[in-house]
Amino acid sequence: MTSSSPAGAPYDPDAQVHLGVFYTGVGPQLIWTDPDAPPHVAIETFVHVARLLERGLFDAFFLGEGLRVRENRGRVYDLDVAGRPDAITQLSALAAVTDRIGLVATQNTTYNFPADLARRLASLDLLSGGRAGWNIVTTDNAWTGANFRHGGWLPHERRYERATQFVEAAKELWASWEPDAIAGSGEATSWARPGAIRDVERDTGLVRLRARATVPASAQGRPVLFQAGDSSGGRELAARHADVVFSANTEYDKAVAYAADLRARLAGHGRSPDSLRILPGAAVILGDTPEEARERAEWVHEEQISPPRAIAFLEQYWGTDLSAYDPHGPLPGIEPSETELDPSRGTIPIERRTGKLALIAQWREQAAAENLSILQLVRRVTPRQRSFVGTPSQVADEWVRYVRTRAVDGFNITPHQVPSSLEDIVDKLVPELQERGAYRTEYTGTTLREHLDLPAPISL
C-alpha cells in the first residue's frame, strides 16, 4: 500500500503512532482453522493477547460485539467462530490482569438503555483505573431486533438520532458526580456530600429517563468514546461526541480526505482538531523480504476464503442452497432465487435483483474466459482485507508518513492469526517505529485518555 504525500501537506515531525487491536472474535479475517490457534472464546486467549499488547505498549485492546449470531440457510453460520462472550464482561476480567492497556467495548445504542449501559461502562472505567472506552454502534436490522422486546422498532434513518440522544444522556450521567462528591473519613456524617450527585432527567423523543448515576468518575473522568460509522450521520455523531474514530479509510488519499472532512465538522461543533483521534482499521502482513510478505499475503487471502466459504459466498447471491456444488467445479448453471437466504431481508427488491443478475452474468463471463472454478473465482472477486504488506522497515516508513502528514493518528489492527501475527508486530514492527522516534518506549500515563494524548472531557 503505497502513494506519495500531497504537495503542501501538513507535516508534524514529532507525531506519534497510536495503536489498537480490534479483536472481533468472529468474521472471515480470523484464520481460526490454523492448527496453532488457541480457543477464540477462552479467557486464557484474551489474557494472553492483552498482556502481549501491553508488552508492545499499545493504546487499547478493542473488542467487537454482536447481538445476533450470523446465519446461512436458516442455520448458524459455523464457518467462522460463531459466538463470543459479552465484551464488558471480558474486559472486566482483563482489567484485573493488566495494568495499562486500554479496554474498549463495542456497545449498541439501538437496543441498550442509557442508564444501564452508562453504569456498566463507568464500572469498568472505575475498576480499571480509567482505562475503559466505548465503541458506539447502531443497528437497523430488524432480525437482530427480534432478539429484543423492541424488535424492528426504529427506522433506519433514525438510528443516529437515537444514538446522539443516547450518548448525550450517558455523558450527562457520567458528569453528574462532582469530583469531590465522596466525603472524606473522619467527621463525615454521610458517605457522599449532600447535593454532590445530581439527578438526570431527559425526554428527548427517543431517549427518556429519570436516573441517578451510582458510580463515581474514574481517573480519566469518563470512558473514552469511539465511533465507527462512515455515513454522514456517523461522521456527524463522531464530530459532536467521539474522542476516537475507527474508520475504514486506509488508502492514503482517502484517509487524507476523510480526516479533512472530520476536522471541518469538528470546527462546526466548536471542537479543536486535536480533540479527536483517527484510527483506521487495517491488517498487517510482515515478511523478512518484500517477496516473502507478498507470498504470505496471498496465503492469508486463500486461507480466509476456504472452499466451504466460497460456496456460502455464492449462496448469498443465488439465494438458494448450493451445498451440492463442488467448489472446485464450475459456477452453478441455475438462475438466482427471488428471495434472500437471510430471513430478515425477505424478497429481493427489483433493483437489488437486477444488480445481482448483472453481477452473476459478469462472473460467469469471467469464469468462462479464465477457466475458473467456484473457489478460484470467489478468491478473485472477493475484496482483500485492507493490509499493509512488507518488511517491518517498509511498513514502519508507511505508518510514519501517514501519521506525520496527519492523514491518520494511528491504526486499529485486525489480526488474521492470533497470537502469531500480533507477536510479529510487537517484536518486529514496534522496534522499527521506536527507532524512528514515532512510538513510545514506555507508558507515560495510566489512563486510556493519557495514552491517546486526549484532553480532559469538557463536561468535567
Task: Give residue ranges: language-model regions.
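Internal, glycine-rich beta/alpha segment that forms the wall or movable "lid"
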Residues: 6, 11-17, 113-236, 240-241, ...
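Active-site mouth loops of central-metabolism enzymes
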Residues: 29-44, 106-115, 151-153, 157, ...
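Substrate-recognition/cap regions that form aromatic- and gly/pro-loop-enriched pockets
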Residues: 351-431
